[in-house]
Amino acid sequence: MKIILTAVNAKYIHSNLAVYTLQASAEKAGVFPEIREFTINQSKDSMLRSLFLAHADVVCVSCYIWNISIVEDLITEYHKISPKTKIWLGGPEVSYHAEEMLEQYPFLAGIMKGEGEVTFREIAVYYQNQENGMEGKTLEEIHGITYRDADGAVKSNPWRPVMDRSEVDFPYANLKKFENRIIYYESSRGCPFSCSYCLSSIDKRLRFRNLDLVKKELAFFLEQKVPQVKFVDRTFNCKKDHAMAIWKFIAEHDNGVTNFHFEIAADLITEEELELLNTLRPGLVQLEIGVQSTNPQTIEAIHRKMDFGKVTEIVNRIAKGRNIHQHLDLIAGLPYEDYASFRRSFADVYALRPQQLQLGFLKVLRGSFMYEHTKEYDCHYQEREPYEVLYTKWLPYDDVLKLKDVEEMVEVYYNSGQFVHTLPMIERLYENPFDFFQELGDFYRAKGYSEAAHNRIQRYEILLEFLRDEKQQDEAFFRQMMVLDLYARENMKTRPHFAKDPSEWKNESRNFYQKEAETRTLLPSYAAYDWKQLQRMTHLEVFDYDVLGSGEKARRVILFDYQKRDPLTGNAEMIDCSSGFYA
């Protein structure tokens, strides 16, 4: 009996926690399924080839919002070339309309609904027993499935009771297959909140994995020095003792390499947790915080509990530690959130200066409260995944398109981290930073820039063009701010054409490095190098403005040390060497 678990991931670096967990569960019962992982960017032909040549008796496919269309196409064609293979689907994208799926695809054997660890194991054993002529549970006795019986009739069994999370088998015994990929880990399941747009709100039965077991498994990741472990817990810190124990453990066993990502509710963070977080190695932890909106009416309508004042306090206090990457989320298209309201929400969250500001758009998921109340909100969304909002009674499609442009500009100019010093100077021109991103998005559209790909330097050039033509700003000043940002990121091999001619300070630069090679006062970590090597390994730039301060007219000499970098931005350490440079 050959059973294959199939996943179609969004990117190669992603791994599918579900199929590996199901595999581990089945192996405990003496069934050894294989795994085939693909990505949404692979050709259908290559996926079909891989599955066909496996000659499977049973194929089970994991279905999510990002892959369901591909999966539907794949199984339709696969059934044609392997008609005897039993095809099962599972996952959140099929659990809530299983009967409809079986009617739509008459070749499907069944759908696994809800938690699949035990369900899949019982299905795998069922088919193995069939092959070996052994007795055991029939499909009629397996909870958590909708299936087709021997006569072709669609039958639905009761949903399976949720299981103890400590009984879930660890799927990462062999880490070789996960090299250069993100490890996903689950220490709890369920969510204490009832956000109307989220499927996690359906399962309010919070269950936690035994902490001793969690520590043992995290120790394994740390020993293996995996690059990143991403916790998929919906609200990691909803139980303080659980969160504190894990954070303390990874702090005490930090290997200097592994990074841990957590999704948290910032307003639940306590003083004790804050104190611990502020002691962590820079880069050890990333925090993702879903704000979604700061409109009180919207927050109430989506059944979300959030004290934005507390969120602001916590995010700011974490930011002061300069050791934790913070990723904040907003969602456009929620009830009572019109364009003006979203503009205010954006300004509120942008003011917190997270390392990443994610602008998402409401996705209307089957099974969610929002799905059941679309008529009430006059909410119209795409018929196919990702089921993204098109318009609501508060947000017309014209405004959705504008917000799409803002999203793109934020991604390019803020989240890229390539304009860290330039953006604050531009923001001085605006009452609300949202307006800058909107105007820049309009400029991209008007010039046709949105239709083409642009390299890094071109992004700077377009921004300069915008500031000159649309804002009538001092181009010389912003050129120098952008030169600062460019060299902060890397020691440029090709000098940007809009930078000043460095021959203006050639002699002073040589004198500076010769003196530094003698004194080692500013670059002590370069003790093994002579002055010419220092000059190549670092960068010295003369500015006509106070680029690290007020932006006022003032000569500043900045030394970029690429051996020392900011743990959050990745930018080189910048040293003001103005004093005595021209002496």
Model-derived regions, located:
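Residue-level recognition of beta-strand->loop/alpha-helix junctions
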Residues: 7-9, 36-39, 62, 330, ...
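Proline-aspartate-enriched helix->loop->beta-strand connector
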Residues: 55-57, 226, 354-355
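A short, flexible N-terminal coil/short beta segment enriched in small residues
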Residues: 1-20, 29
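A structural motif corresponding to the C-terminal lobe/cap of the Radical SAM core domain
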Residues: 240, 252-255, 261-268, 272-438
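N-terminal [4Fe-4S]-dependent radical SAM core
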Residues: 1-3, 142, 146-187, 556, ...
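Glycine-rich beta-alpha loop elements in corrinoid/cobalamin-binding modules
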Residues: 2, 18, 25, 32-161
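Radical SAM [4Fe-4S] cluster-binding motif and immediate context
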Residues: 166-320
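Radical SAM enzyme core and accessory elements
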Residues: 2-6, 44, 57, 107, ...
